[in-house]
Structures are given as structure tokens and as C-alpha cells.
């Protein structure tokens, strides 16, 4: 019995090794799981479910094959692929989840999220996030021609990379008070997230007890997953 979590694969046509590694993961690891949770940034960018990229169809087919085996795949939107919608979810057999969600695994309640909402010290990003998550702005963007959406996404990505080079590592990490607030609000002792690309399992002082914050790694040189069993929560890295 095991439930698997992954995040921050940033799949794109420019990184075929990561795509191949993910397909192997689905075929050899995920098929043995009770469920698979993808906590955002499965793709490096997403400009709409109508984008005819062959990569999207390949990933959808592989995820749907997992679905047909009776293994549910849950998806939490990330900061790169927040526009993944119901159409792609149907094609891939994924179940879309809210930004923050409490799941009960083997009798243990766990808060799961992408993680960008915890990085409140990055004021510029949080302002950007509020803007692009406005439903009206999203609808307007999706009405634009694909070619224009591609150009806008590329420009936004370039601006983001340039801005991040000028930010401190501390600003781009989670705010500890936000972690405590979420754990207390949802009345849980365990949190799993991605986004920061800093894989670790942290102990969190809750006052009268201790909690855990498990952080997934990004798929760059190797894969990263968290395996939850009735006995343990384990952070695992593995070669592609």
C-alpha cells in the first residue's frame, strides 16, 4: 500500500529526457500505487487545453492508461500550468483538486498544495499570481489566438526568470508563519508541497507537538517523489 506524490516536472519539448523519465515512472512505479498526486507544474507552460502540442497528447494518453488500471491521478495546479482545464483532465483521466486540499491517507490527514501560496515574502509574485488567477483575465487570455498566447507566455516566462535572478533565496522560499497558519487552520500535522525545488522533510514546531512539512524536488537531473504508506512518509530521488 502506497500513495505517490510528484511535482515540478516542467515537461516541455526541450527536455525529452525528463519526459522519458516520467513515462518510465508511470509505467514502472505509478502502476503499483494506490493513487498518484501531481502537485503542480507538470508542464513548463500551459496556454490552454486547445494547444495541439504532441507532447500533451502523449502525456494525456499515458495518464489515461493509468486511469484505466484503476489508479486515480489527482492534480493540483501549479504556477506554470494553472490553466489546465476540464478538457485535458478528461483526456488524461485526472481529477482536478482545489489549490489547497486535505486528504485522508491510511488514517492520516495531510494538507497538499503546490506551495506557491506559502511564499508570501515574494510580494511581486503574489501580486502577479492574484492577477493571472482572476477568472475574467483567464477567459480573455484563452480567447486569444494560440500564436499570440505563445508569445505572451514566452515573454512572461522571460520576465519571471530575469526577476528571480534578482531575488534572494529566502524571499522565494516559504514563509514559516504561513506554514504554521495552514497547519493550524486545517488542523493537520503533515503538509506536502512542491514549488520551491528544495526537497526535504522538515520538522515543524506546533507548540505542544511537532508536525512535518515534506517538500518535493524538481525533476532536473533526477526524479523526485514522496511515498506515503500506512507506516511512513518517505522522500525518494531516483535516476530517469
UniProtKB/Swiss-Prot annotation:
<comment type="function">
    <text>Hydrolyzes the pyrophosphate bond of UDP-2,3-diacylglucosamine to yield 2,3-diacylglucosamine 1-phosphate (lipid X) and UMP by catalyzing the attack of water at the alpha-P atom. Involved in the biosynthesis of lipid A, a phosphorylated glycolipid that anchors the lipopolysaccharide to the outer membrane of the cell.</text>
</comment>
<feature type="binding site">
    <location>
        <position position="114"/>
    </location>
    <ligand>
        <name>Mn(2+) 2</name>
    </ligand>
</feature>
<dbReference type="GO" id="GO:0030145">
    <property type="term" value="F:manganese ion binding"/>
</dbReference>
<keyword id="KW-0378">Hydrolase</keyword>
<comment type="similarity">
    <text>Belongs to the LpxH family.</text>
</comment>
<keyword id="KW-0444">Lipid biosynthesis</keyword>
<dbReference type="Pfam" id="PF00149">
    <property type="entry name" value="Metallophos"/>
</dbReference>
<feature type="binding site">
    <location>
        <position position="10"/>
    </location>
    <ligand>
        <name>Mn(2+) 1</name>
    </ligand>
</feature>
<feature type="binding site">
    <location>
        <position position="41"/>
    </location>
    <ligand>
        <name>Mn(2+) 1</name>
    </ligand>
</feature>
<feature type="binding site">
    <location>
        <position position="8"/>
    </location>
    <ligand>
        <name>Mn(2+) 1</name>
    </ligand>
</feature>
<dbReference type="InterPro" id="IPR029052">
    <property type="entry name" value="Metallo-depent_PP-like"/>
</dbReference>
<dbReference type="InterPro" id="IPR004843">
    <property type="entry name" value="Calcineurin-like_PHP_ApaH"/>
</dbReference>
<keyword id="KW-0443">Lipid metabolism</keyword>
<keyword id="KW-0472">Membrane</keyword>
<keyword id="KW-0464">Manganese</keyword>
<feature type="binding site">
    <location>
        <position position="167"/>
    </location>
    <ligand>
        <name>substrate</name>
    </ligand>
</feature>
<feature type="binding site">
    <location>
        <position position="41"/>
    </location>
    <ligand>
        <name>Mn(2+) 2</name>
    </ligand>
</feature>
<feature type="binding site">
    <location>
        <position position="195"/>
    </location>
    <ligand>
        <name>substrate</name>
    </ligand>
</feature>
<dbReference type="GO" id="GO:0009245">
    <property type="term" value="P:lipid A biosynthetic process"/>
</dbReference>
<feature type="binding site">
    <location>
        <position position="197"/>
    </location>
    <ligand>
        <name>Mn(2+) 1</name>
    </ligand>
</feature>
<keyword id="KW-0441">Lipid A biosynthesis</keyword>
<dbReference type="InterPro" id="IPR043461">
    <property type="entry name" value="LpxH-like"/>
</dbReference>
<feature type="binding site">
    <location>
        <position position="164"/>
    </location>
    <ligand>
        <name>substrate</name>
    </ligand>
</feature>
<keyword id="KW-1003">Cell membrane</keyword>
<feature type="binding site">
    <location>
        <position position="122"/>
    </location>
    <ligand>
        <name>substrate</name>
    </ligand>
</feature>
<dbReference type="InterPro" id="IPR010138">
    <property type="entry name" value="UDP-diacylglucosamine_Hdrlase"/>
</dbReference>
<feature type="binding site">
    <location>
        <position position="79"/>
    </location>
    <ligand>
        <name>Mn(2+) 2</name>
    </ligand>
</feature>
<dbReference type="GO" id="GO:0019897">
    <property type="term" value="C:extrinsic component of plasma membrane"/>
</dbReference>
<feature type="binding site">
    <location>
        <begin position="79"/>
        <end position="80"/>
    </location>
    <ligand>
        <name>substrate</name>
    </ligand>
</feature>
<comment type="pathway">
    <text>Glycolipid biosynthesis; lipid IV(A) biosynthesis; lipid IV(A) from (3R)-3-hydroxytetradecanoyl-[acyl-carrier-protein] and UDP-N-acetyl-alpha-D-glucosamine: step 4/6.</text>
</comment>
<dbReference type="GO" id="GO:0005737">
    <property type="term" value="C:cytoplasm"/>
</dbReference>
<protein>
    <recommendedName>
        <fullName>UDP-2,3-diacylglucosamine hydrolase</fullName>
        <ecNumber>3.6.1.54</ecNumber>
    </recommendedName>
</protein>
<keyword id="KW-0997">Cell inner membrane</keyword>
<feature type="binding site">
    <location>
        <position position="160"/>
    </location>
    <ligand>
        <name>substrate</name>
    </ligand>
</feature>
<keyword id="KW-0479">Metal-binding</keyword>
<dbReference type="GO" id="GO:0008758">
    <property type="term" value="F:UDP-2,3-diacylglucosamine hydrolase activity"/>
</dbReference>
<feature type="binding site">
    <location>
        <position position="195"/>
    </location>
    <ligand>
        <name>Mn(2+) 2</name>
    </ligand>
</feature>
Amino acid at each position: 500500500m502506497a500513495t505517490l506524490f510528484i511535482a515540478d516536472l516542467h515537461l516541455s519539448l526541450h527536455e525529452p529526457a525528463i519526459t522519458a523519465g516520467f513515462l518510465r515512472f508511470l509505467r514502472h512505479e505509478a502502476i503499483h500505487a494506490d493513487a498518484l498526486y501531481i502537485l503542480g507544474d507538470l508542464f513548463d507552460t500551459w496556454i490552454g487545453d486547445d494547444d495541439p502540442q504532441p507532447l500533451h497528447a502523449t502525456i494525456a494518453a499515458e495518464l489515461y492508461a493509468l486511469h484505466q488500471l484503476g489508479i486515480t491521478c489527482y492534480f493540483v495546479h501549479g504556477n506554470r500550468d494553472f490553466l489546465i482545464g476540464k478538457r485535458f483532465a478528461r483526456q488524461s483521466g485526472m481529477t482536478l483538486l482545489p489549490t489547497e486540499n486535505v486528504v485522508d491517507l491510511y488514517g492520516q490527514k495531510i494538507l497538499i498544495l503546490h506551495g506557491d501560496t506559502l511564499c508570501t515574502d515574494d510580494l511581486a509574485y503574489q501580486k502577479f499570481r492574484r492577477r493571472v488567477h482572476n477568472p475574467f483575465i483567464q477567459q480573455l487570455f484563452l480567447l486569444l489566438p494560440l500564436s499570440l498566447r505563445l508569445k505572451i507566455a514566452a515573454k512572461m516566462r522571460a520576465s519571471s526568470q530575469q526577476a528571480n535572478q534578482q531575488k534572494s533565496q529566502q524571499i522565494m522560499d516559504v514563509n514559516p508563519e504561513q506554514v504554521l497558519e495552514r497547519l493550524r487552520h486545517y488542523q493537520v500535522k503533515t503538509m506536502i508541497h512542491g514549488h520551491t525545488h528544495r526537497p526535504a522533510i522538515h520538522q515543524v514546531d506546533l507548540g505542544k507537538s511537532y508536525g512535518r512539512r515534506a517538500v518535493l524536488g524538481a525533476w532536473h537531473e533526477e526524479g523526485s517523489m514522496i511515498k506515503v504508506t500506512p507506516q511512513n512518509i518517505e522522500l525518494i530521488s531516483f535516476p530517469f
